[in-house]
Amino acid sequence: MEKMYNVGKIVNTHGLIGEIRVIATTDFPEERFQVGNTVYLFEKNSKKPEKLIIRSHRKHKNFDLLMFEGFTGIHQVERMKEGVLKIKETQLTNLEENEFYFHEIIGCTVVTTDGEELGEITEILTPGANDVWVVKGADKKEKLIPYIADVVKEINIDDQKITIEVMEGLLD
């Protein structure tokens, strides 16, 4: 089976007309959830994915609300709760130079320009102006590294290694 990537988790239904409430886990929800696009539903107790075509998409509070072709009522989508939406690897778009997908960054080892290993990126937060990488070290403590040019000096996806310049107070 082709490699697939998570783009969202279904947390609930919304209204009575077959909308579902999704927490996006993708870098590009507007692109991933575009009308006409295909996503694959992996339900909690099912091994086989269900192919779904997006009929509508809108933002509501912190959620993405989706409707799928062929689903017109709450009774048809209730079973999807707690399901995960994925896309195939072939659906990924090529990024510009120095742009990366989250799955390429998560798992990379972070080292300083002095060669000190800080740990592995376990999560990426998107609080606002720039992403923040959560780095867990051998001491199990989490360090927050902002993805900005002053800090991140080199990203080598092939070697799964990221070099950073430690600014004063960054690791305190």
Swiss-Prot record:
**Top-rank taxon:** Bacteria
- Where does the record place it? Cytoplasm
Q: Name one Pfam family in it.
A: PRC
Q: What is its main location?
A: cytoplasm
UniProt entry tagged with the keyword Oxidoreductase: no
Alphabetically sorted, this entry's keywords are: Chaperone, Cytoplasm, Ribosome biogenesis, rRNA processing
Q: In Gene Ontology terms, what is a biological process of this protein?
A: maturation of SSU-rRNA
InterPro entries per the UniProt record, alphabetical: PRC-brl_dom (IPR027275), PRC_barrel-like_sf (IPR011033), RimM (IPR011961), RimM_N (IPR002676), RimM_N_sf (IPR036976), Transl_B-barrel_sf (IPR009000)
Gene Ontology cellular-component terms listed: cytosol; ribosome
> Briefly, what is this protein's role?
An accessory protein needed during the final step in the assembly of 30S ribosomal subunit, possibly for assembly of the head region. Essential for efficient processing of 16S rRNA. May be needed both before and after RbfA during the maturation of 16S rRNA. It has affinity for free ribosomal 30S subunits but not for 70S ribosomes.
Q: What is known of its domains?
A: The PRC barrel domain binds ribosomal protein uS19.
Binding partners and assembly = Binds ribosomal protein uS19.
What this protein is called in its record is Ribosome maturation factor RimM
Native source organism of the sequence: Listeria monocytogenes serovar 1/2a (strain ATCC BAA-679 / EGD-e)
The gene is rimM
